[in-house]
């Protein structure tokens, strides 16, 4: 048996003691005073910051939204089961963030960036992006000059949207607001196939889970999930998750924007986010304002929508952008853009309510969808009179700008005369001509569900309409004429369409279009 040497043992013990480090870490811990309705009041976190994440003893996290004299109000990011009076809550010294990466594309995630589509965890390189972030300053932006093709004829012709713009889609329920935005996402497939993808983020706020599943399935079938991320905070999710879902979507969009690529984000819809924010604010006992919304509901939407912009093309300047997250600094490039299409639901067409007027004043224009037009069969039901794009005109391609120049005015004139014509039948030939042309243009601007048009097809058919080349085609045959006309151009004159796509519109091109229209319209005489 080996002899035990005390000197060796004491040397080993001394070595162990010298290498020992105290594992005690200081944590600031508070106690839950009250919990319920997704809100916890915590006592003892005297140094906690506004917007900081707090972790409860069951692993649940919450965001500090109220700092009061003797306690803090924390909104819970999940169910409150397992948190009770007397539970502990500790500071994390982090703000709410989510991990974003290339492999997030094609997935359905929740507000915290965790996948909820049952396809396993998100792999690849992930970058931490904060939910709340300051919008880029004026120095880091440039004007909107590139078009974002929506594939919707009425929008691309009369209310054009540019990359980096915020264009509000507003209307009553069931007037096709989501459809306009989803068609825009579907239309980006053309750019994805050409190797210049516009990454799309669809944020579903307070919708039924079945509706979101239906949208995801449809995008999958049409091949659009290859460049789309869906962020879902369903109707059954806690109000804080619905409030922060748009911020999560914006953070994902900023990842693409700041790495020099174009992105498009749809917020469907911000009315539900405002309602969820009102619920959270009232539970936190903040004083209510107009329509019981809190005083900072304008700021909620403005700080979200200001994050959509066109970033300056200079990489050197872009790398110094204000409030850049540390994680993405190595991959920052200039020239990216984030285009926002927020949706707002109105009650009985009242655009002058609180939330609609707020968002109208924040955005760069609005597309107003009219229930009466929708019910009369004009779909998309865009009311051209009060729809406007404040910056998109500079982003239209030249050929579209030329053909659609008078279209908006013509249609407004037609609507006015149409109402007048109901009272009298003896109209002069000029008025009759305006009405007949207007009726055909209304038919041209109609479009099927999930059926976006390429820009060259749009320019060709709108040229035919604005030059009154369809005057001999009966109104009920216009859609038939359109299908024949575009099929003829696509099979016989592909080069003409390619020239239109490149923005050219000269006499040789218009001659081809006019001859084709004459030839096809002869069938309908």
From Swiss-Prot:
It is an enzyme of class 7 (translocase). Its EC number is 7.1.2.2. The record marks 387 as: Required for activity. It catalyses: ATP + H2O + 4 H(+)(in) = ADP + phosphate + 5 H(+)(out). Keywords: ATP synthesis, ATP-binding, Cell inner membrane, Cell membrane, CF(1), Hydrogen ion transport, Ion transport, Membrane, Nucleotide-binding, Translocase, Transport. GO terms for molecular function: ADP binding; ATP binding; proton-transporting ATP synthase activity, rotational mechanism. It is found in: Cell inner membrane. ATP binds at residues 171-178. The keyword Membrane applies. One of its GO terms (cellular component) is plasma membrane. Gene3D superfamilies: 2.40.30.20, ATP synthase alpha/beta chain, C-terminal domain, P-loop containing nucleotide triphosphate hydrolases. It is a peripheral membrane protein. The keyword Secreted does not apply. F-type ATPases have 2 components, CF(1) - the catalytic core - and CF(0) - the membrane proton channel. CF(1) has five subunits: alpha(3), beta(3), gamma(1), delta(1), epsilon(1). CF(0) has three main subunits: a(1), b(2) and c(9-12). The alpha and beta chains form an alternating ring which encloses part of the gamma chain. CF(1) is attached to CF(0) by a central stalk formed by the gamma and epsilon chains, while a peripheral stalk is formed by the delta and b chains. Belongs to the ATPase alpha/beta chains family. Produces ATP from ADP in the presence of a proton gradient across the membrane. The alpha chain is a regulatory subunit. This is ATP synthase subunit alpha.
